[in-house]
């Protein structure tokens, strides 16, 4: 982003989006007032103020952004109720899908631009059509050296150190190195998060009009997934009452009978992931080269290349396991940016072409994850799925990343089709974005993009599965569902995709702008972890040609000499959303909502941000789930998969709050002492789908639902709030000590998980914690 300093505020302290331009939304460098989307620019000052370490914290700084637990380490949030796409300096990070996967590091982050709605034509839409998160990475200064050292520790075993240095190396060349070491424990029993990150950047001015920007990032993370606790029901949410009891039949991936006979209150530190053998390791490498040739003030060429590599595994002894083994993406994109005039009309063009190749080898096993059978009041050694029963559920041993032996289900096993897949996707595209400024009041922006995509996918466990007896010949009459009845591989044809947008912006005065945007696009919808795509046994268009439609309008205000910015937006969006086991089915979602955001910074001593969003999502077909809420007596694990819903009813999308509000205030005295406060409020959240059940056609329905006529109401997390506060002191011009209190009132807050497991996993937010950070800057 290009810097514009106002009101005497130093670059590092600026939070006003009107003081910068950004190309994240449309590829053109636009002021936020001229951008016909609701976009939020998160500056370094805002990210540091809340110590943002993962996308779950975005909900404290922007509207319509909410992250469910994502099995412990969300790597993308939901925006407007849908998962988002992640970009690095304008280039897509392919290894995201539903928030689950390798944890990301913020060691390389300078600022973040969050654009609500699907990515425009320059970036190309992906499965995360809720919004795009474009990370602008740290770059060195050509004129001065800077050094920052940061040490942080808290009362819940957080231990983080950062060293960041950069500046000119020689005439026309600058470099920067940032190293972060996170060696944290956890509030929860036997949990840890150890992440080492090394980021480096070089900036070379080869000539006065040719620059090269290079960055590389290596992140190594060893951790344990945090799935929270099981046996979710309303009493557990309301007062912590946990039902105890064990399995009365052999533990299997489906159909285990569990007799719940007692109650207790679990220690708040208890989670299901405590057994020995549970663990995860992820290695993530990103290398990027950006070349810019400025032919003149009105014509430039930008070539951007990103190589993205991931190698990881995860195993939960309860049992879940997956791996992304030796997976990588490489993309090269060339933009031609031209400014010209035709009569009185000023034109800005960004057109170009791109090619991306994505190889993801993903192996999963959630076939043997009978979450409700484990009694978390017992010894953690009992939270283990019997290895001898893995084959019965379709899982076989294989070698995951790092040579680790885990159990996985072949992708051609029909009951869990394509959840294991060796995916090789090609995507070539051309694009055009054109802005026409007719007068100071009126501008029109339109964009067009065409993609050609082709997929080669195969089952990496096919031969092993056949040898283990999972093929049709060894299925004992359970085919075609519970056997490897799907083909080993598929090579699709080339498919064409379109993407188009048109926007009108009207500014009656310089301080006010109004916009209306229409965006319709097709995209590839990944259906396995880490962005893998599988089409074994299905029509490839179900994954390679999904669609979304967005209509959005808004008002923006730049007031009080650029010290107050207010943005409002209303929108309607339609898209296909993944539902059910593994997200293998689709439902059409109809999303409406409204957002308001405000930034206020009258001086370098004070800033404040606030936002509110309302979201309402209706599904054409219901979102299924695994278990009914836990109840006293006999429970049948996986019983809710037997639900048949009554027709002629409306289904609301579960798992996200309709209302989200946040506010942040930061005040600094002239003597270096400062204070900070932050509040987040979330509306009620249903853990699973609610609705009327067809009792005649459904199976394994609990008696209480039969008695009330099949009116199923999901457990609901009530209104919640989190209040954080901090005091800091800057002294001797270079040093800052900051004392923070998170969850100041020690609220018993809860975070839901993916709605399919909404009655199986729920996470308690840790109680009040104390954090001390010391920073030195030179």
What are these regions (language model features)?
Residues 1-45:
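Short, acidic, small-residue-rich periplasmic hinge/interaction motif at the N-terminus
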Residues 67, 76, 92-116, 136:
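Short acidic/polar hinge/loop motifs at secondary-structure boundaries
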Residues 107-110, 122-200, 206-210, 285, ...:
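Outer-membrane beta-barrel translocator/receptor signature
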Residues 182, 186, 203-205, 209-288, ...:
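Acidic/polar loop-and-plug regions of large Gram-negative outer-membrane beta-barrel proteins
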Residues 205, 346-358, 421-575, 591, ...:
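Structural signature of Gram-negative outer-membrane beta-barrels, strongest in the C-terminal barrel
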Residues 287-309, 325-462, 507:
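Face-selective signature of the C-terminal outer-membrane beta-barrel domain
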Residues 337, 348-349, 549-553, 607, ...:
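Conserved C-terminal beta-signal and adjacent last beta-strands/turns
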Residues 563-576, 585-695, 733, 745-746, ...:
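Gram-negative outer-membrane beta-barrel transporters
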């Amino acid at each position: 982003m290009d810097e514009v300093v106002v009101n005497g505020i130093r670059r590092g302290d600026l939070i006003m989006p009107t003081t910068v331009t950004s190309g994240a939304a449309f590829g053109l460098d636009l002021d936020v007032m001229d951008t016909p989307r609701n976009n939020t620019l998160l500056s370094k000052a805002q990210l540091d103020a809340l110590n943002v370490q993962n996308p779950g914290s975005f909900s404290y700084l922007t509207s319509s952004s909410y992250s469910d637990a994502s099995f412990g380490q969300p790597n993308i949030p939901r925006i407007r109720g849908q998962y988002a796409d992640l970009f690095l300096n304008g280039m897509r990070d392919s290894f995201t899908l539903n928030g689950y996967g390798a944890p990301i590091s913020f060691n390389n982050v300078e600022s973040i631009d969050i654009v609500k709605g699907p990515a425009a034509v320059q970036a190309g839409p992906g499965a995360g059509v809720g919004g795009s998160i474009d990370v602008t990475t740290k770059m060195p200064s050509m004129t001065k050296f800077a050094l920052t050292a940061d040490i942080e520790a808290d009362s819940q075993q957080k231990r983080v150190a950062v060293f960041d240095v950069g500046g000119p190396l020689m005439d026309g060349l600058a470099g920067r190195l940032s190293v972060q070491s996170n060696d944290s424990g956890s509030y929860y029993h036997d949990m840890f998060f150890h992440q080492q990150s090394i980021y480096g950047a070089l900036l070379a001015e080869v000539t006065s009009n040719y620059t090269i920007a290079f960055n590389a990032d290596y992140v190594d993370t060893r951790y344990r997934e945090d799935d929270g606790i099981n046996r979710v029901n309303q009493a557990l949410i309301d007062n912590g009452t946990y039902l105890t009891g064990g399995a009365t039949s052999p533990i299997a991936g489906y159909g285990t009978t569990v007799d719940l006979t007692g109650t207790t209150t679990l220690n708040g530190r208890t989670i299901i992931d405590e057994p020995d053998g549970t663990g995860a390791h992820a290695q993530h490498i990103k290398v990027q080269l950006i070349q810019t040739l400025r032919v003149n003030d009105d014509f430039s060429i930008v070539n951007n290349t990103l190589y993205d590599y991931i190698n990881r595994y995860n195993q939960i002894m309860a049992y879940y396991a997956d791996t992304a083994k030796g997976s990588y993406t490489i993309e090269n994109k060339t933009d031609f940016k031209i400014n010209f005039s035709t009569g009185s009309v000023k034109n800005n063009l960004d057109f170009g072409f791109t090619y991306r190749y994505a190889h993801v080898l993903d192996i999963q096993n959630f076939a043997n994850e009978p979450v409700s059978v484990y009694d978390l009041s017992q010894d953690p050694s009992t939270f283990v799925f019997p290895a001898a029963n893995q084959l019965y559920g379709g899982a076989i041993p294989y070698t995951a990343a790092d040579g680790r032996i885990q159990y996985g289900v072949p992708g051609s096993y029909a009951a869990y089709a394509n959840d294991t897949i060796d995916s090789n996707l090609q995507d070539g595209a051309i694009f055009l974005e054109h802005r026409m400024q007719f007068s100071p009041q009126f501008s029109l922006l339109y964009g067009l993009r065409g993609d050609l995509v082709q997929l080669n996918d195969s089952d990496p466990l096919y031969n092993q599965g056949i040898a283990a007896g999972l093929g049709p010949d060894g299925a004992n009459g359970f085919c075609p569902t519970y056997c490897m009845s799907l083909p080993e591989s598929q090579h699709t044809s080339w498919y064409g995709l379109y993407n188009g947008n048109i926007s009108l912006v009207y500014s009656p005065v310089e301080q006010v702008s109004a916009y209306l945007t229409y965006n319709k696009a097709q995209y590839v919808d990944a259906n396995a972890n880490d962005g893998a795509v599988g089409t074994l046994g299905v029509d490839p268009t179900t994954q390679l040609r999904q669609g979304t439609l967005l209509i959005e309008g808004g008002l923006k205000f730049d007031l009080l000499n650029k010290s107050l910015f207010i943005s409002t937006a209303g929108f309607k969006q339609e898209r296909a959303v993944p539902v059910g086991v593994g997200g293998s089915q689709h439902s059409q979602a109809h999303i409406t909502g409204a957002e308001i955001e405000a930034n206020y910074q009258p001086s370098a001593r004070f800033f404040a941000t606030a936002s509110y969003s309302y979201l309402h999502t209706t599904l054409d077909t219901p979102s299924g789930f695994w278990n009914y809420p836990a109840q006293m007596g006999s429970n049948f694990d996986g019983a809710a998969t037997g639900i048949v819903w009554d027709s002629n009813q409306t289904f609301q999308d579960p798992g996200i709050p309709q209302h989200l509000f946040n506010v942040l205030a930061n005040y600094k005295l002239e003597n270096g002492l400062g204070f900070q406060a932050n509040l987040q409020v979330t509306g009620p959240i249903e853990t699973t789908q609610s609705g009327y059940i067809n009792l005649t056609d459904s199976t394994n329905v609990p008696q209480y639902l039969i008695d009330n006529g099949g009116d199923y109401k999901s457990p609901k997390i009530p209104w919640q709030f989190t209040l954080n506060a901090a005091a800091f002191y800057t002294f001797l011009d270079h040093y800052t000590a900051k004392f923070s209190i998170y969850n100041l009132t020690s609220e018993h807050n809860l975070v839901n998980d993916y709605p399919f497991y909404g009655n199986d996993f729920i996470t308690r937010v840790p109680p009040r914690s104390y954090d001390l950070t010391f920073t030195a800057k030179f």
